[in-house]
Amino acid sequence: MSTVAAEQAGGGFHEEWEAGPTVARMVLGAQLRRLREAGGHSLEDAEAVLRRPREWISRLELGRAVLRLREVADLCAAYGGADRDALATLLGLARQANAPRWWAAYRDVVPPWYEPYLELEQSAGLIRAYEAQVVPDLLQTEAYTRALLEDHRPAGEAERLAALRAVRRRILHRPSPARLWAVIEEAALRRGRGGRAVAFAQFEHLLDVCDLPHVTLQVLPLAAAEAPPVAGGSFTLLRPPQPELPDVVYVERLNGAVYPSGPDAVPYWHTINRLVLTAAPAAATQSILWRIVRDL
């Protein structure tokens, strides 16, 4: 993915992070909204420039629609306030928004409801996760992943999904890795997946990742008192590195996913913060993992 996204600071734009198409659309929409409002223009003004309905303009500014390059230039000309460098950056965002997805090679096993998450995860600066059933995807070994998937997927599909998950895990090992803060139920760690050899290798991997400075892993003990109820089970919170973009909540269901936003997202942040306080401290995680290993 190319470094094309922009952030406004002191009236100018500068390139500073790698964006996938989904995040590029979000940043482009936010910047165009900022230009529109700074110039005192209404949605009706944008509607007149693009000859598109107001509802579509609103979707554009939320990052849910894609503009042609000519349309970006037309809006900038109508709004004013974007110099040559700013226009070049916005056009770069528009190109990136139309670029092939990084996961395109796995399109055959990626359902539409999962596409936004794949883009947002790889662009996130902070990932906070609560997992009640299994080890979080980004912390799984390949053998553990295959054991999980082969339980309920055809062999070929399981292999493809395992390969995709392996690519996703690189986010923790790139030069500027994402920060991961995960809370895992002890019961999830005690569930056997793939036999003893697979389980031992998975625990060894978790012990290793506890030493990574950008990974915080906490365990919610079986005997945790007053553990906060979590309606719907596991969920993930994604924070983009751009302050103008909202946090994203991802809740996977049996045959789909939901992305709560606005007021609907607030309870998830309250819940993850309560879980962090209820779970054992991160400093105790390795000793808890060793205790579980001895029980296998």
Task: For each feature predicted by the language model, list its residue ranges.
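A ubiquitous short alpha-helical element
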Residues: 56-61, 256
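Key DNA-contact positions within bacterial/archaeal DNA-binding proteins
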Residues: 44, 54-56
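C-terminal regulatory/effector modules of DNA-binding transcriptional regulators
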Residues: 195-296
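Short, well-ordered coil loops that connect the C-terminus of an alpha-helix to the N-terminus
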Residues: 52, 81-82, 212
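Alpha-helix initiation/capping motif
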Residues: 22, 53, 68, 111, ...
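Short glycine/serine/threonine/alanine-rich loop segments
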Residues: 41, 52, 215
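Interdomain hinge/linker segments and adjacent boundary elements that couple functional modules
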Residues: 2-30, 34, 38, 43-48, ...
